Amino acid sequence: MNPVTKQFQFGQSTVTLETGRIARQATGAVLVTMDDVSVLVTVVGAKSPAEGRDFFPLSVHYQEKTYAAGRIPGGFFKREGRPSEKETLTSRLIDRPIRPLFPEGFMNEVQVVCTVVSTNKKSDPDIAAMIGTSAALAISGIPFAGPIGAARVGFHPEIGYILNPTYEQLQSSSLDMVVAGTEDAVLMVESEADELTEDQMLGAVLFAHDEFQAVIRAVKELAAEAGKPAWDWKAPAENTVLVNAIKAELGEAISQAYTITIKQDRYNRLGELRDQAVALFAGEEEGKFPASEVKDVFGLLEYRTVRENIVNGKPRIDGRDTRTVRPLRIEVGVLGKTHGSALFTRGETQALVVATLGTARDAQLLDTLEGERKDAFMLHYNFPPFSVGECGRMGSPGRREIGHGRLARRGVAAMLPTQDEFPYTIRVVSEITESNGSSSMASVCGASLALMDAGVPVKAPVAGIAMGLVKEGEKFAVLTDILGDEDHLGDMDFKVAGTDKGVTALQMDIKINGITEEIMEIALGQALEARLNILGQMNQVIAKPRAELSENAPTMLQMKIDSDKIRDVIGKGGATIRGICEETKASIDIEDDGSVKIYGETKEAAEAAKLRVLAITAEAEIGKIYVGKVERIVDFGAFVNILPGKDGLVHISQISDKRIDKVTDVLQEGQEVKVLVLDVDNRGRIKLSIKDVAAAEASGV
């Protein structure tokens, strides 16, 4: 096919979509160029599903090639390796808005690969990758209810909303939000903010939706000209005979099971009913159905039962109404030897969160397309299988854990002190010990508590809450503090973190069309009500950071030295600073401007190291008495060391009031003596006196 190109204006950026020149064997391939950022997006769809598959195997892989920024990878192998955290998060960002647009019952494998092939280092390539994904799917012929558009939004109080801000603009922005959706609906929001109001956050979502209509129009034009024929695929018809049979036999029992408030008891009862359904209706004889189909229909009845109960105003699975937060239990200081810890329990969701303080050299080194940089704040989220009563894989974190950790980090990051205010590296780890919905928001609450327990001067406590939605026709119910089942069976996952003043993080995933501005306003309003409730209970346990850092945390001292003295402190080949660190058991970081940070496991170690640095950088003061050591004797006097690296000369005439024939008659090498500084010339040479010490002491020097 001949190459086809579409160009359009997207805010301040010129975007070009090109297909038919590169990756022509893929089901769909588009090279998207947004200013100087180019991303190649390919989509491949299997023509038939694998035998026995009962799920939709969609995978999205976003990869940043270092050649795109004119760099060679670091490390020994000099080639790209496993996905970075940034690549994993962007893969999830692309996956979330497209997944709900594939039709129900579509089980063919689909793989999306987004490769950053050129970048200007000024803007994040993620928006270009999302636009390219939309275009590649639109031209592929694969069943897909798109296209989608995507935009990043910043906010400045004086300027207002900013479309697709650059990295530089984001530095002064109070908001970093990515929004994706179709022509009629918003499907995904990912954001972090500096205590913006609910109205400002909603305004940003609507602003993005209006702006990315230009993307959707351009993708439709490209698909009209270069799109492949739509696949001849039809959704499998619902087996109404089996649905009615299971409902008649077990429908009431399923409804009763969903009144059991204890999660494991409820799951056990539903498991028994599912086994009964298989025993009754599965088999190979006539009038029977495959066991997998029976289980699918049983799951469909669960889905309908829970949703009908909720939209008709009946109590939720655990007996709550739509606005009630589950009972909270909040503890801090639960682990004796850690720097800060908290145990946050909300119903059957529990997070054990630990804060650890480290030195500047403990910061995470990030190798990005823009170059290397350090990150002094880390939040790691772990979700072991025992948290849901299961056996499972243990090992390195998966995509979900990385994504949840980043969301929790977004929630608390805006409230952290600056590096100048608090020059420690901070690592927070959230161990999910029980899970039944909204463990990421439990991590936000636990992180805030653990940081305050550690004495980190956060600006304000932060809490988070997860909201849900069930919508059937014109009826809908917004749910506060959703359970795991409500998340799975609902139409929206809406997570909000913030302080009592405003929102710090907002994440939204919507599975259906028809989410109106009214519904989002209600969800944000209920989330605010719940957040203030949780903050009130957290404040009863710990309302502000502890006045002192934990005694287990390293002591950090700061000082400033003349930049000319840096080499003296470091010494030849680093010998001096290494000796100080080995002797005092402290660590020392020196910046080019002379800023010195000293970290010690104890206060005594840090103070000892500081005294050594002060001694090295000190200047000899005229008229001051020092106790020094005779380093070298010459015919005309003796050289005495009075400060580290600083020797002065005591001329033979300045040793004693009496006449001396030989210096060695009075002084010996290694002898300690008191000396008075007489003068320091412009070359730094120090003149000392021993004979004038007594008179100087008598005069009070």
From Swiss-Prot:
Principal subcellular localization: cytoplasm
Gene name of this polypeptide: pnp
PROSITE patterns xref list: KH_TYPE_1 (PS50084), S1 (PS50126)
This protein's record includes keyword Iron-sulfur: no
NCBIfam families in the record: polynuc_phos, PRK11824.1
SUPFAM superfamilies from the UniProt entry: Eukaryotic type KH-domain (KH-domain type I), Nucleic acid-binding proteins, Ribonuclease PH domain 2-like, Ribosomal protein S5 domain 2-like
Official protein name in the record: Polyribonucleotide nucleotidyltransferase
Gene3D superfamilies: GHMP Kinase, N-terminal domain, K Homology domain, type 1, Nucleic acid-binding proteins
Catalytic activity: RNA(n+1) + phosphate = RNA(n) + a ribonucleoside 5'-diphosphate
